[in-house]
Design a protein with these regions (language model features):
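A boundary/linker detector
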Residues: 1-9
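Short, non-ligating residues that shape and space the ligands of small metal-coordination modules
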Residues: 39-43, 75-76
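Short cysteine/histidine-rich metal-coordination sites, predominantly Zn2+-binding motifs
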Residues: 47-57, 81-92
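Short Cys/His-rich Zn2+-coordinating modules
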Residues: 8-22, 44-55
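Short metal-binding segments enriched for Cys and/or His
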Residues: 59-85
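Short metal-coordination and nucleic-acid-contact micro-motifs, chiefly zinc-binding Cys/His arrays
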Residues: 25-30, 45, 59-65
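Short cysteine-rich clusters marking metal-coordination/redox-active sites
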Residues: 33-37, 66-69
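Long, contiguous alpha-helical scaffold regions
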Residues: 86-146
Length: 146
């Protein structure tokens, strides 16, 4: 599996934490880290997602996590279905718009954001953006001529 860097949210003075991979493969669960081959663990993360135009969406989601690489792996299909369910109730006109998972937020800030006591600007100030966003290409097993 090869690693490719993708576009990254430029957060200025924001705290940078974790690396992130949005897994587009339905049939690949990444039970092992695609970089270091260590077994991944399941952990809940509070993801901050920017939805065009200028909308923040907070998602409490179980993701695969490699502690060695500090890599969070989230399945794209699961993220999109959870976003669709949430946005259909709060803001249905932006469903299907482009989005970018930009970072994580602490649980106390997530609760305050969902309760409506934090503005989007305050959430951005308190969140941790990803250090890097990775892409991995899955190469199916088999014989390949050299």
């Amino acid at each position: 599996m090869s690693r490719k860097s993708s576009k990254q949210f430029s957060g200025g003075k924001l705290n940078k934490k974790h690396k992130f991979f949005l897994n587009p493969y339905q049939d690949c669960a990444f039970t092992k880290c695609p970089k270091c081959e260590t077994k991944t663990k399941i952990r809940k993360f509070l993801l901050v997602i920017h939805v065009e135009p200028q909308q923040l969406f907070l998602l409490n989601k179980q993701c695969k996590y490699c502690a060695e690489c500090d890599l969070i792996i989230a399945k794209k299909q699961e993220v999109e279905s959870l976003m669709a369910a949430g946005l259909s109730q709060t803001n249905p006109r932006i469903m299907g718009n482009d989005y970018l998972v930009i970072g994580t937020v602490e649980r106390k800030d997530w609760k305050a954001g969902n309760g409506g006591s934090l503005s989007a600007h305050e959430i951005v100030e308190r969140m941790s953006v990803f250090k890097d966003q990775w892409n991995f290409e899955v190469i199916p097993p088999g014989w390949y001529p050299s």
